[in-house]
Amino acid sequence: MDAPSTSSGAQSKLLMPGDDEADEDHQNRGDPNLQQKQKIQLNVDPDYDDDEDDDCFIDGCEASAPITRELVDGAIERRSKDRNVKMSIGVYDEYDDDDDDEEETEEDQRRRFVEGIRNIRHKQQESFDLEEHPIPVESEAMRQFINQQVNNAMMFNQDNSEFQHIEFEPIVKQKGPKIIEGYMWGGQIGTGSYGKVKECIDMYTLTRRAVKIMKYDKLRKITNGWENIRSEMSILRRMNHRNVIKLIEIFNIPAKGKVYMVFEYCIGSVQQLLDMEPARRLTIGESHAIFIELCQGLNYLHSKRVSHKDIKPGNLLVSIDFTVKICDFGVAEQINLFQRDGRCTKVNGTPKFQPPECIYGNHDFFDGYKADMWSAGVTLYNLVSGKYPFEKPVLLKLYECIGTEPLQMPTNVQLTKDLQDLLTKLLEKDFNERPTCLETMIHPWFLSTFPEDQGLGRIMERMRTGDRPLTMLSSMTALYDGITPEDELIIEDNLGIIQQILPINLTSEAVLERGSFPGFKFLEAKPGDGPDGVEGSEDSAAPLGPQRRPSSRSMPTCAPPGPAAGNAQNSTAENGAETDGVASASDPPPTAAPGAPPRRRKRNFFSCIFRSRTDSA
């Protein structure tokens, strides 16, 4: 026998009684029901091919008798068994007159209905029966394998020392260098009211820069944030002086919602130099060198009719060659070209460095140039003594002290008469009597010379010998795999001479601190150094902890640390219980006389409104 064909074009073969036309006419005349029986078809697999050895049909012979049911059933059973071909008879028995359907009684219908309901309930139970649906063999084997591995890894068997330690090596993916607009990003080197400052390096010129990053959302929340940024950009674009920070580039990325301002790089600020000293002050020569650079920068700004209005040590940056540069022009104001003086109307700046005409508010205007000179005088006072000329823990008391109290010279350092005279003139409460920048530059103390003015002294030595911060160190290392600054390089020349190159003296830290200058001699604190609250105390000679920078919008005015426990009573007796104007809640109320009606405790009007911002912290 031939195998069954799988051709898609095979036609199904119809087995009908009498394939011959003559035999068909004879049967049509003899049998009246033949037309109905001719409609009966045998549905056979369409892939079935004719077989010459079939017993039902013999080549060259006509059918001797009509095909009976027994003959067809036998052929179907035989061929299904031999060839695995499924064959079925469609409506073969549909018109069998011998099979008469018996009429179903009412009892049979009831029995059939009950049996159907029972089958439905049985199927629903099988769907929830777990025994009828066993877990596949593959899943059970996988579960056993996982349980075995977990038991071995979790060290449940303490006797077996093979699994006492789990070897775990996390996959660490090194972060690649971040490059935006041709600048490789480094670490953060500072923060401000409008954003943070990061170090970067120009990929084309290999020059270190500092980028100021400002977010759109933060600028919207700050009052006049966008206006101040636009003013700073317009002013810095026109500035070109060695004592004014230089603006390199400005670019904007709307997709990130950030504005970037690229400046020249500086290693730190004057405030950081003060914080590194245990005495919180500099020498007279170092202060003189910084003040000369400050006045030269202010003279240039005033010649361009620009008032900075926020001069303080935190806004004076120091370059690698110890050049002081004025920065942070966020509140600076461009004065009208047709004005004869430096009239300004917007009051901005740090409270401790603001002049009396700004904090009082009793003038319709103030001179911006004279306000900068007041701030320069406070800065000079802070550099030489480590203190502020007017300082109170509460903002209202601070303003009152600036406007009414006379100037007191510091007692922890010895000042010359020329320096005292200059401080007195710069801190004159009447701005009409206050000297201008040109008048200050011809003062005798300003014209005097110190070794620090010629690049000598402690600070210049520190700048030459200290570690150089480089926050792009990790990013630059990632560009060249296998080369690290800590590795010692051994080079052999053509003559066979081996030369060993020591590792580069770099650090990835961004903040100047005492650890950056090993072996450097700092100014030790003496009695009287530090804030006014600890003046004259025995413990003031000890190194002071890190303090916050002067007050700003992001860092409000903080109260100085309280006196020591041993001198608490003396300081209270000298200063008085109501110096700060805030009634202490821990003090017991005064004892009333016997028989007198109870009196309510008097409270200062400002104790609720102007409660110290930092006392609660």
Swiss-Prot record:
Active site (UniProt): 310
Regions of compositional bias (Pro residues) in chain numbering: 587-597
Subunit structure: Interacts with strd-1.
Domain Protein kinase: 183-446
Cofactor: Mg(2+); Mn(2+)
GN (gene name): par-4
Annotated keywords: ATP-binding, Cytoplasm, Developmental protein, Kinase, Magnesium, Manganese, Metal-binding, Nucleotide-binding, Serine/threonine-protein kinase, Stress response, Transferase
Gene3D superfamilies membership: Phosphorylase Kinase, domain 1, Transferase(Phosphotransferase) domain 1
Gene Ontology BP annotations: asymmetric cell division; asymmetric neuroblast division; asymmetric protein localization involved in cell fate determination; cell differentiation; determination of adult lifespan; establishment of cell polarity; establishment or maintenance of cell polarity; positive regulation of dauer larval development
Biased composition (Acidic residues): 46-57
Stored SUPFAM superfamilies: Protein kinase-like (PK-like)
Free-text function comment from the UniProt entry: Required for cytoplasmic partitioning and asymmetric cell division in early embryogenesis. Controls the asymmetric cell division of the Q.p neuroblast lineage. Involved in mediating cell polarization via regulation of anillin family scaffold proteins. Phosphorylates and restricts the asymmetry effectors mex-5 and mex-6 to the anterior cytoplasm of the zygote and maintains these phosphorylations until fertilization. May phosphorylate par-1. Required for strd-1 localization to the cell cortex of early embryos and may be required for strd-1 protein stabilization.
Amino acid composition bias (Polar residues), ranges on this chain: 1-11
Similarity annotation: Belongs to the protein kinase superfamily. CAMK Ser/Thr protein kinase family. LKB1 subfamily.
Tissue expression pattern: Expressed in the gonads, oocytes and early embryos (at protein level).
Reported phenotype of the disruption mutant: Maternal effect lethality. Blastomeres cleave synchronously until the fourth or fifth round, when synchrony breaks down. Cells also fail to segregate P granules, with the posteriormost blastomere tending to contain more P granules than other blastomeres. Terminal stage embryos fail to produce intestinal cells.
Protein name as annotated: Serine/threonine-protein kinase par-4
InterPro entries named in the record: Kinase-like_dom_sf, Prot_kinase_dom, Protein_kinase_ATP_BS, Ser/Thr_kinase_AS
Positions annotated to bind ATP: 189-197, 212
Top-level taxon of origin: Eukaryota
Record Pfam families: Pkinase (PF00069)
Substrates-to-products reaction catalysed: L-seryl-[protein] + ATP = O-phospho-L-seryl-[protein] + ADP + H(+); L-threonyl-[protein] + ATP = O-phospho-L-threonyl-[protein] + ADP + H(+)
Gene Ontology CC terms: cell cortex; cytoplasm
